[in-house]
């Protein structure tokens, strides 16, 4: 019975101490291998009770159904507002909370000074509401009440008339609001995009959250924000499984940034049509994160050449054969010709030469269902069965 790819990977992992995490990078145009490996990844995560997050960077963001069957999970589109990834985003009482908000705002072009003005704006809101006796949790809808200078002035006048603050305090608070109001107006426009990720409920183990980042290919800031929110959520809840689907096209630096920032204990796998079309820096991030790599047929010869270099060289000893025939008459009697004693065969072994382990032409012509497994420093060609 032939060895399956899972058995081969398991045998390689057992020989290493400590065994590397079972995190897979699949690169290539063979959709059959993507479906087989993707199905095993999802089934394994579901059996262990892990919520699944699919970052779908395919054209239109519809690759989840094409590359891997979602069996058992209840699939939820993150854009519907049913899932909360950053309920605590507006909680800026700690350095961690401030850093999380600053990271998200940076994706929308907020520099450090403007981001800190947003933090001051949120704290201004909390302080004013506390003085008014309102203890309800901070929400985007409530924060919008402070988007107008007229409303803020009215609220502060209420506090002054009720004796909760002095006239000097009212003037001071109005001055503080004037300092941060410009950043507050920009923040309100960002809140419109963040609203679907703040409301809703926390993902449970039976939920598969679909991130259609490929549908926002023309909106880089939106892609970066979605990946930043996911990375922030997974940092706080590392017991999860992340599956990245990528069609190998376009600029994908936001994916490598997310991979770099995810916790080491979080299970992450990636199925891409071409990991070697990334920049060298981005490709190194992927290769360092995924200890187990599977390479199938690649369509671009430039990528095949890079994969050829990645797989390394092997020593090849080439042999040459020569035959010397004695043409002299006395050496060509009937017995000499019959017994072959009129010729001399020579076999020469040349010095070892370094040749590619897998040539680029071979990689580009790999048949369906066949892939190169790179794990534990060894490389093998195996077939993939469902």
Specify the residue positions occupied by each region the protein language model found.
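Alpha-helix N-cap/helix-start and coil->helix boundary motif
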Residues: 60-61, 275, 301
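P-loop NTPase motor core of the ASCE superfamily
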Residues: 109-116, 279-386
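Conserved H-loop
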Residues: 57, 270-278
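P-loop NTPase motor domains
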Residues: 1-266, 281-282, 361-366, 372-385
